[in-house]
Amino acid sequence: MGVTKKPDLNDPVLRAKLAKGMGHNYYGEPAWPNDLLYISPVVILGTIACNVGLAVLEPSMIGEPADPFATPLEILPEWYFFPVFQILRTVPNKLLGVLLMVLVPTGLLTVPFLENVNKFQNPFRRPVATTVFLIGTAVALWLGIGATLPIDKSLTLGLFQVDLTVK
């Protein structure tokens, strides 16, 4: 990926285009009425049609009906709580587990401030924020997948044979 040339703001042709408002939208096509009136309803109706089509073709239940007399072996939370559940499950000290849970939203709130002096929107030009995001995503996926496994295989995802028993 090459470095793009910055625009010369002293160029009279570019200044004339910017004065006409052609700097933001390169093609000069207005959002109203073309996008908002014609394209957006097509996308919305297409999404609704796909959802209805999938519901008609595969009318399955959301889950198994609840049986009040049978307790599952391991009670798992909803899928979006798997990483946090894995933190609580693997950390031996509950106070440390709660502090780690507080660090998750705190870390998410600090990501925009990592490179706030960098005004580029391209992720390739924001290497620190992009790296932190990718590492955070990998850790969240690792914790989420590990939460679905038994506790002895949860940290290694069952890929390595590790003996964690205390002797």
From Swiss-Prot:
Pfam families: Cytochrom_B_C. The keyword Coiled coil does not apply. Keywords: Chloroplast, Electron transport, Membrane, Photosynthesis, Plastid, Thylakoid, Transmembrane, Transmembrane helix, Transport. One of its GO terms (cellular component) is chloroplast thylakoid membrane. It is found in: Plastid, Chloroplast thylakoid membrane. GO terms for molecular function: electron transporter, transferring electrons within cytochrome b6/f complex of photosystem II activity; electron transporter, transferring electrons within the cyclic electron transport pathway of photosynthesis activity; oxidoreductase activity. GO terms for biological process: photosynthetic electron transport chain. It is a multi-pass membrane protein. The chain crosses the membrane at residues 36-56, 95-115, 131-151. It comes from the Eukaryota. The keyword Cytoplasm does not apply. Component of the cytochrome b6-f complex, which mediates electron transfer between photosystem II (PSII) and photosystem I (PSI), cyclic electron flow around PSI, and state transitions. The 4 large subunits of the cytochrome b6-f complex are cytochrome b6, subunit IV (17 kDa polypeptide, petD), cytochrome f and the Rieske protein, while the 4 small subunits are petG, petL, petM and petN. The complex functions as a dimer. This is Cytochrome b6-f complex subunit 4. It comes from Calycanthus floridus var. glaucus (Eastern sweetshrub).
